[in-house]
Amino acid sequence: VTLSPYVSARTKTLDYRYRQAFRRGAIAFEGAHTRDDLIPGEDRGYLFGEGRFELRDGFRLDFEIKTTSDDAYLVDYGLPDYDRLRSEVALERIKRDTAFRTSFIYFKTLRESEQQDEIPSRIFDLNYEKRFFPGGLGGEMRLGFVAHSHTRTSDADITGRDVARATVDAEWLRSWILASGLRADVQLGASMDTFDIRDDSAYPDQITRSTPRAALTLRYPMTRHEQSGATQFLEPIAQIGWTHVSD
């Protein structure tokens, strides 16, 4: 813990910093508490913090906090001049064949041109992907799920729009290397999206769409070695793809 008091005729400020390491993680906070004549009779200050923890079963928890007592404090005291404050907590696990991450983010605007209740201040994300290798079909299969939402505190039409989305995706990938050295990559997939929209009369409350896709890519990698020891690489690529969005 580090405490640094500062006293003058116009302000009384206590700066503080706290850091601690644990067996599975670490945290760090810094901030200040102020009483000054810019806003008489009011407590002012800021708090920034971050941390990371390695949890059981390969999970990792990260967090970041940024908050101030008022929009002008950082500028008044020569601190980093953020136009938006971002706080986040996230949980993730990355393994060889699976990837998972979920997070919640909160934004606080410091811009004079923005109203706090009209920005998407609360944001939730969830991502999950799994891959496996089917024996009979060959290649690689990927299955994914994505969820997202952002909300505004305003209930006004259009400017207070809130959106939630969920996506399910499946994809098959396979490659062949022919005797000539030509490589062929095939990609087949499809996704399904559903949207929930509130406080916006320009859109329906529910939208669902599907998006199949296919692609064939041909590559012909070539190398040439120079007498100087340099190696040149050339890889012509041709691709044809197709997709269709249906509501």
Show which residues each predicted segment covers.
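Outer-membrane beta-barrel proteins and related beta-barrel translocases across Gram-negative bacteria
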Residues: 1-247
